[in-house]
Amino acid sequence: MKAQSIEDLMNQVSTANLQTSVAQLSGEQSATINGSTQTITSRVHSNNDLAADYIKERLETMPNLTVEFQNFNTTGKNVIATQLGQTNPDDIYIICAHYDSVTTYCADDNATGVAAVMEIARLLSNQCTDNTIVYALWDEEEIGLRGANYYAQQAADETNGNTRDNILGVINMDMIGYDGDAPGAAGDNDFDIDVRNIANSIAIKDDLISILNTYTFDLNEIVVNPGTTASDHSRFWNQGYSAVLVGESWETNDQTPDYHTSNDRVEDIDFQYMTELTKLVLAYTATKANLIAVDNTVIQTATDLTSNQATGTYQWINCDTNTPISGATNQSFTPSTNGNYAVEITNGGCTEISNCVNFSVLSNEEFQPNEIKVYPNPVKSIIKIDNFTESEIDITINTISGKVVKKTNSRKDYIEIEFDSTASGVYFVNIKSKTKASTYKIIKE
């Protein structure tokens, strides 16, 4: 996975994925479960093992997750997927939703929340984080918040030498798919943040609002304080943990009219609205878990490709065949043939892959100082090149990451290249003729 910004990840939230997951969880669409095509006809607590298997299997396809059932009575089982933090594994953020229902279908309550958790896990499991993320899907919410209650009690238990889990924040998504306007239509897009002044719950609310103001969303928050205790987040409040509920706006009476009935169907879900809420919780999670940056940029010269990540292990890849190159495991790589190349970098348990870089093999002979001169260095506005070779030369100027910013050719003995509008930084001027090639590092002030 390439290094991602939070905004990059938000833009990758897939409405189509959310639609498919909600349709499959609510039994409107079949899915492959336990190796065969099946339909989830029930998520009622007494008959929802197939739904649990579906969730667990989907999470198990994602990298960097440890997925398990947490059984808490003869029929109840939570699905817990843990993404261990690389720096602070004991600092935990939980993103959760209940997967059980009171009757058939129940698309909004709460296939929407489960689908959002799985979509966030799909995107963040490819990233490395400083802190631990737990993706939790609760059972038996509808008959007393039992699954979340068990987890929270176990996390807080300090008897018999146990250590209280350092859960820093919980976001519970319960019913995030209904907005009173026609699905996909412009409207108020109100949603509730239910919060109480327990532990640092108010700070979670503030962080969510900060994210709303930092990135672009089509959402309008309604802060409910004191918030409802009728969903799983409240069981974390009971144990003194920081938690909030994110969901459609009961506070403004803009919740599904089909609540707790089999009329709660996919056709009534506003997937644009649901996508926005999923993006919001993803951005919060990525921010608090703190994405670890592995530099996946590549420096390109006339003769070599070099990873800009100074530490780690490396594997160069032939992008044209999508295969690793045998023996190419150093920070720098000298291609022997023309082609497209990338490098996979692993550092501290985190793996990133660079963009593919097009490389043309050139002569190993370099220009002599009396043949080519590139100046001034540093440069402010004009790059000057003296060409004493009496040959045509190709000139390509790249950023440190390999991006081409200028490209030209000339056989003149004096060449000027406008550089005033180019951003400050380090650049490489690659000059080649039919028989020689050299790279010159310059600094733009």
Labelled PLM ranges:
Residues 2-46, 100, 254-265:
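N-terminal capping segment at the start of a domain
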Residues 9, 18-26, 67-70, 78-82, ...:
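Structural recognition of the beta-strand scaffold that forms the well-ordered cores
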Residues 20, 27-84:
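A non-catalytic alpha/beta surface segment that caps or lines the substrate-entry region
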Residues 31-33, 72-75, 85-88, 99-104, ...:
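Solvent-exposed loop/turn segments at secondary-structure junctions
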Residues 101-200:
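Acidic/histidine-rich catalytic neighborhood of metal-dependent amide-processing enzymes
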Residues 181-293:
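Active-site-adjacent substrate-binding region
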Residues 300-309, 382-386:
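A short beta-strand segment in extracellular, disulfide-stabilized domains
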Residues 313-321, 329, 333, 337-340, ...:
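C-terminal outer-membrane/trafficking sorting elements
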